[in-house]
């Protein structure tokens, strides 16, 4: 889904969602994609391999062919898409599942934010606190420009407090959420 706005889906991702017989993902992603989901498609709140694999097998037993699994953010940057892709590829490799697996990325959140802010990002340090730890203060001190992917509002508040405590309250922040 990329940044989560249906206007910003790639055509490929939009088609995959529209043609899917089953669409899986977190509740908010299913809601965001709802305008593109076929009326007769089944929606399932699932995005972890442990939940998806048994469900995919049950769908396949019923003859379901097209299944879309939704993720937000960038598919290649600390995304849950990686774990699901690896799990599905392993099932295919072991001969347990016959499937073609395609990752259809949305528009990159980094690219989108940088464009909206009028900033380049080829010289930026890219850091994620989305489900992981990072020493943002050290990065801000060391790097000329830092692009930071966060989990949400609570991360922003915590990072702001850390920067202020470190005497970095004068740094420029551009926030997209």
Describe the role of every protein-language-model region.
Residues 100, 109-177:
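Beta-strand/loop-alpha-helix module characteristic of Rossmann-like adenine-cofactor folds
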Residues 1-102, 134:
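Class I S-adenosyl-L-methionine
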Residues 1-4, 21-24, 104-107, 125-128, ...:
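A short linear-motif detector with a strong N-terminal bias
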Residues 9-10, 76-81, 107-112, 156-158:
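Short glycine/serine/threonine-rich phosphate/pyrophosphate-binding segments
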């Amino acid at each position: 889904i990329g940044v989560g706005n249906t206007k910003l889906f790639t055509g490929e991702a939009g088609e995959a969602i529209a043609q899917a017989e089953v669409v899986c993902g977190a509740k908010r992603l299913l809601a965001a994609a709802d305008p593109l989901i076929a009326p007769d498609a089944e929606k399932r709140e699932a995005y972890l391999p442990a939940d998806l694999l048994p469900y995919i097998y049950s769908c396949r037993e019923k003859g379901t062919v097209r299944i879309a699994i939704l993720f937000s953010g960038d598919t290649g940057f600390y995304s849950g898409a990686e774990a699901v892709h690896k799990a599905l590829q392993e099932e295919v490799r072991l001969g347990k599942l016959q499937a073609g697996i395609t990752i259809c990325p949305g528009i990159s959140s980094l690219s989108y934010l940088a464009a909206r802010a009028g900033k380049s990002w080829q010289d930026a340090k890219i850091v994620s606190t989305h489900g992981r730890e990072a020493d943002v203060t050290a990065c801000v001190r060391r790097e000329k420009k830092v692009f930071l992917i966060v989990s949400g509002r609570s991360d922003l508040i915590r990072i702001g407090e850390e920067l202020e405590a470190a005497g970095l309250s004068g740094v420029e922040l551009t926030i997209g959420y």
